[in-house]
Every structure is written in C-alpha cells, then in structure tokens.
C-alpha cells in the first residue's frame, strides 16, 4: 500500500493510452486501468463499456479498474438496462480471478448509479465499489491518490 495515498508531492505516475474508448489510461506500475468517459452515460455507452471490458479480459489478467464519472454531462441509463448489464457482466466474468472496480462520481445521480451497480455485483468476482472521494478510492485500490486524478499525459500505444 502507498505510504500516504493523499501525498501529491511525488511526480505523476507514467500511464499509457489503451486502444478502446477515449480517455482510457493504463498504469502498469499499479496494475490499474482508469477510464474517464465524457458526455452522456446511456444504454449505448454502458454496452460499449461491457464490450471493451470483455475484450481486455480475454487479452490479459484482470487489472484493478477505476471509472471516473466526473466528466459526464448527463446520466440517461435505464434502470432495467443496468440490471441487464450487471447480469451479463456476472456471466462473462464467471470463473475469472476477482477484480476490484472503483466507480467515482462527485455528482449524486452518477453516484446513485454506481451504488446500484455495486449492490448488483455483490457476491460476484467483480468487487465494485462506489466512491465520492478519490483518496478513499485510492486507499481501497491500493494506489497513490495522485494516480486517480488522471492528470498525467499518457504515452501513446506502441
């Protein structure tokens, strides 16, 4: 675990851009993939997230995930679609090593969606948790809090 997750005196960690949706970072030193989707969280974007996750899960061992909803301008996902998404993710992830997924939102609606997903994933290998504070999420993920600010300039893919 980092000495002090709130300590931002160290240089920013090195990240790489991953193929897939925009605003996607990989932090190999922390075994972390972070995504900061912009725009509208709707059924289509939720499906895109699911497809992308299936692709990366087939390509490599599970990594910790951090999804930052702070750049969303609107949340328009149907509740029934969130239930279906959680059911599919449980089926797709069956038998795979457990993974931590931190969902951050400073907006109450986004946080509510994250909490609902957290409750739907209880008892599955996907350990999803909703957060309104990045430092608390960093402690739970065992990464420096500076990483979760997503302010570094990622290195392009090779």
What are these regions (language model features)?
Residues 2-158:
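Amphipathic, Lys/Arg-enriched alpha-helical "gate/interface" segment within cytosolic domains
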């Amino acid at each position: 675990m980092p000495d002090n997750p709130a300590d931002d005196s160290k240089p920013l960690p090195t990240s790489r851009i991953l193929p897939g949706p925009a605003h996607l970072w990989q932090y190999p030193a922390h075994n972390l993939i972070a995504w900061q989707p912009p725009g509208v969280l709707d059924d289509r974007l939720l499906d895109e997230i699911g497809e992308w996750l299936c692709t990366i899960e087939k390509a490599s061992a599970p990594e910790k995930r951090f999804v930052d909803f702070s750049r969303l301008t609107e949340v328009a996902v149907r509740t029934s679609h969130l239930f279906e998404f959680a059911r599919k993710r449980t089926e797709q992830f069956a038998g795979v090593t457990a993974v931590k997924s931190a969902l951050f939102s400073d907006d109450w609606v986004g946080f509510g969606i994250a909490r609902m997903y957290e409750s739907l994933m209880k008892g599955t290998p996907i350990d999803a948790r909703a957060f309104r504070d990045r430092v608390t999420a960093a402690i739970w993920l065992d990464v420096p809090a500076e990483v979760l600010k997503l302010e570094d300039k990622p290195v392009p893919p090779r």
